[in-house]
UniProtKB/Swiss-Prot annotation:
Belongs to the fimbrial protein family. Keywords: Disulfide bond, Fimbrium, Signal. Its main location: other. This is Type-1 fimbrial protein, C chain. InterPro entries: Adhesion_dom_fimbrial, Adhesion_dom_fimbrial_sf, Adhesion_dom_sf, Bact_Fimbrial_Adh_Pro. It is found in: Fimbrium. GO terms for cellular component: pilus. Gene3D superfamilies: Fimbrial-type adhesion domain (2.60.40.1090). Residues 1-23 form the signal peptide. The keyword Signal applies. It comes from Escherichia coli O6:H1 (strain CFT073 / ATCC 700928 / UPEC).
Amino acid sequence: MKLKFISMAVFSALTLGVATNASAVTTVNGGTVHFKGEVVNAACAVNTNSFDQTVNLGQVRSERLKVDGAKSNPVGFTIELNDCDSQVSAGAGIVFSGPAVTGKTDVLALQSSAAGSATNVGVQITDHTGKVVPLDGTASSTFTLTDGTNKIPFQAVYYATGQATAGIANADATFKVQYQ
């Protein structure tokens, strides 16, 4: 009986340590969470999905872009404005900016890389009226705002500035909303 009691005591002591160890909390370093945003005093707020969007222009054969002014098929994208109050502003235009192709203020230059970039091609943006949007601080055509959510449509094309050569053809533009 005494041996059984001692065996039970030893077993209990050993398993108690295991049970305690199994329930111990382990904490490791994680990372940083960046919260990004802005409080605005304007007619609308830009939807978070419109901040950093990617417009996929796809693959276009260089043969299609072999002369100055040749274009690819247009690809649509929108800039969405939320919580709009048409009493504050009746309309909005979008101002795009970015590096323009030399001599063409309405064609966005491609990002240059050491090797592998397409040449003699850029990106051109048109607004909801079909008007080409310059990159010089001029706003797109005014879009009439309604209360609530507004989706302002645009289109982008590859635009040849000469005989295009094959390669990566990425470009970046920033935008601002100009309320009118």
